[in-house]
Amino acid sequence: MNASSSETLEVVDDRFQKDRSWTVAWIAGLIVVGMVLVLAGMGRRFWCECGSWVPWSWDIWTAHNSQHLIDPYFFSHVLHGVLFYWALRWVPRLNRTQCLLIALGLEASWEILENSPLIIERYREATMAVGYTGDSIANSVTDVAACMLGYWFSSRFPWRWSVALFVVSEILMLIMIRDNLLLNVLMLVSPIPAIQEWQSG
């Protein structure tokens, strides 16, 4: 193969990579837009009713929780991305792009399910979130972004870093708000009254 042919192949390969990147970006965008439209159709409001445009809210016991861009549960969604990356990595015949889009689709689907009346009521009955009314659309979009951040982190650093991120995040959340991803799942699936009492204390 001469130099001219080699350069031509490189140009074609670069163009293919760019086209594929744009395709992935379009699909990812459609997933997020689709989630937003579904949430809007479910009657979810875009932002906190309080009218304050402060992008964060750190007090989980107020009506601001899950209504702004960032709250303490942002870090749980980062861990979603960590878990999705390592779970999907071992699924046969899936390439990196497919794994990424599946992770994005799973997180978007969870945001829709989480804001359904069934799950909202379950949160109110079984967890410390007795006043939970669902997420704002803006918060759901940020949660998806947090998931992608965790996914990116796990894809770029050795597995030990993912473990460290998971453990440190869970411990810090437990100290700060008496809740974390593992406790949240446990209380949703099989509530333990003693834990609920401790969380509310």
UniProtKB/Swiss-Prot annotation:
Q: Where are the bilayer-spanning segments?
A: 22-42, 68-88, 157-177
Question: What protein does this entry describe?
Answer: UPF0314 protein RB9128
Family from the record: Belongs to the UPF0314 family.
Q: Which InterPro entries match?
A: DUF2585
Give the record's keywords alphabetically.
Cell membrane, Membrane, Transmembrane, Transmembrane helix
Compartment(s):
Cell membrane
What's in the GO CC field?
plasma membrane
Q: How does the record classify its membrane topology?
A: Multi-pass membrane protein
Pfam annotation, one family: DUF2585
